[in-house]
UniProtKB/Swiss-Prot annotation:
Top EC group: isomerase
GO BP field: glucose catabolic process; glycolytic process
Protein name: 2,3-bisphosphoglycerate-independent phosphoglycerate mutase
Chain sites annotated for binding substrate: H125, R155, D156, R187, R193, R263, A264, D265, R266, K337
Cofactor(s) needed for function: Mn(2+)
Cofactor note: Binds 2 manganese ions per subunit.
Organism for this UniProt entry: Pseudoalteromonas translucida (strain TAC 125)
Active-site residues, record numbering mapped to chain: S64 (phosphoserine intermediate)
Length: 514
């Protein structure tokens, strides 16, 4: 007869942050007797789920994708933005092979280096610090002609806020004396993602043919003229920047182009126009034979171009480590968070590991979840209790989506009901563990439901927060450590299961058995 396993259950309460202020706090307003008792009587602490602690920029709120990647990886997983910024700060950026080698190619052939990208401090698709670092690197490598082609933001930044960024770039060139700002166009044209090729064509022709609707001597004068035409940053018409006595800049044969955006979705189309031999989005008037077109990150696996910061495969994430040690695992959630407990928790892997089972509970078909704040949590719990009873699993990873999905609605009363529904379900799970054997860790991936209104404006607060999240151990006697983060959860699970930790996991157990 097969062994009856007593599982360690990781319950991830999505969007369940910790905030002591009762104002607009749906979690504190909710009647949660189960969690209240566990918090009062069990080993517990608070852990960080935002900012540097999860590989995001300092102060940036957490999110579900980043949270689950860190939970499953057992190490801080740096997001592309943070990786590149860190490389600049550490000096490693200046020796990145894809950048150095391809700048050098253009320099040795006496050709130009063109940097293009979203000129913005927004940090969503790009960051102007990365653009400045790229321009400075080209100058350090001896490029005599360095040109920047700016795409203006106004979506991830205020609609008319580009002036300071343009002034910064013009100051960089004034200092370096080896090139200039060459063109400006709104991201509406250069960064389409819906195959609106007529928009992309305008940007491509500006870059390769210096074909603009307007020409100005400076970037600031171009921007001011755009505002006169009532164009916000995002929609600025194609403008060449041509000082008196200078020629408009075109991207020509032998030049190197560096695309400084790090987010892929809106970088792909214009990249394909440059690099794909059989490109058919529009009829190109010019196809420069470049020394290289360098992508800052991998925009798509099928784009054949050098990548400065390639994907970093995560080795020995928790699921893989379980597989290597013959452990069985269940991943279970509703539709809304199913990808998070599978793909993201597995470090970006679609396939199941050996010994892994997946259980998908359909989320309710309602327009918004405030209409059914309990979602399908009872159905999810039925399956979870059955899995505990079955004795088949060494570990179970479960996500209750309610705090986040109802939190996003901004409806306070519904968020309170969502929290109460989850608390009731936790009671059922703990009762099943007491009856059939097993232990639980209860935590969250980021905050949300603990702040449902902006206290200054009174408007609904529908976003995530940067609050810490609870971490409770329902099991043996243990001591909790302070100052931990999501990346310490997988090492905690291994410690409680009596398993060694892979060297790739740099997190440390949050709970130590007494």
């Amino acid at each position: 007869m097969s062994e009856h396993k007593k599982p360690l259950v990781l319950m991830i309460l999505d969007g369940w942050g910790y905030r002591e202020d009762e104002q607009s706090n749906a979690i504190l307003a909710a009647n949660t007797p189960v969690l209240d008792e566990l918090w009062a009587t069990r080993p517990r602490t608070l852990i960080s789920a935002s900012g540097f602690d999860v590989g995001l920029p300092d102060g940036q709120m957490g999110n579900s994708e980043v949270g689950h990647v860190n939970l499953g990886a057992g190490r801080v997983v740096y997001q592309d933005f943070t990786r590149i910024t860190k490389a600049i700060n550490d000096g490693e950026f200046d020796s990145t092979p894809a950048l150095v080698d391809n700048i050098d190619k253009a320099v040795s052939a006496d050709k130009a280096v063109h940097i293009m990208g979203l000129l913005s401090p927004g940090g969503v698709h790009s960051h102007e610090d990365h653009i400045v670092a790229s321009i400075e690197l080209a100058a350090k490598r001896g490029a005599k002609e360095v040109y920047f082609h700016g795409f203006l933001d106004g979506r991830d930044t205020p609609p008319r806020s580009a002036k300071a960024s343009i002034e910064r770039i013009e100051a960089v060139f004034a200092k370096l004396q080896c090139g200039r700002l060459a063109s400006l166009i709104g991201r509406y044209y250069a960064m389409d993602r819906d195959n609106r090729w007529n928009r992309v064509e305008k940007a491509y022709n500006l870059l390769t043919l210096a074909q603009g609707d307007f020409s100005y001597p400076t970037g600031v004068s171009a921007l001011e003229a755009a505002y006169e035409r009532d164009e916000n940053d995002e929609f600025v018409a194609a403008s060449t920047i041509t000082p008196a006595g200078a020629e408009p800049v075109q991207i020509n044969d032998g030049d190197t182009v560096i695309f400084a955006n790090f987010r892929a979705d809106r970088a792909r189309e214009i990249t394909r126009a440059f690099v794909e031999p059989n490109f058919d989005g529009f009829a190109k008037q010019k196809s420069p034979a470049l020394s290289a077109f360098v992508m800052m990150t991998e925009y798509a696996a099928d784009i054949d171009a050098p990548v400065a910061f390639g994907p970093t495969p995560l080795v020995n994430v928790l699921g893989e480590w379980f597989e290597k040690h013959g452990k069985t695992q269940l991943r279970i959630s509703e539709t809304e968070k199913y990808a998070h407990v599978t793909f993201f928790f597995s470090g970006g892997r679609e396939d199941e590991f050996n010994g892994e089972t997946r259980e998908l509970i359909p989320s309710p078909q309602v327009a918004t979840y405030d209409l059914q704040p309990e979602m399908n949590s009872e159905m999810l719990t039925d399956k979870l209790v059955a899995a505990i009873k079955s004795g088949k699993y060494d570990a179970i990873i479960c996500n209750y989506p309610n705090g986040d999905m109802v939190g996003h609605s901004g409806v306070f009363a519904a968020a309170v009901k969502a929290c109460e529904a989850v608390d009731h379900c936790i009671g059922r799970v703990v009762a099943a563990l007491n009856k059939y054997g097993g232990e639980a860790l209860i935590t969250a991936d980021h905050g949300n439901a603990e702040q449902m209104a902006n206290l200054k404006t009174g408007q609904a607060h529908t976003a995530h927060t940067s609050e810490p999240v609870p971490f409770i151990y329902v099991g043996r006697d243990a001591t909790a450590s302070e100052g931990k983060a999501l990346s310490d959860v997988a090492p905690t699970m291994l410690h409680l299961m009596g398993m060694e930790q892979p060297t790739e996991m740099t997190g440390k157990p949050i709970m130590t058995l007494k």
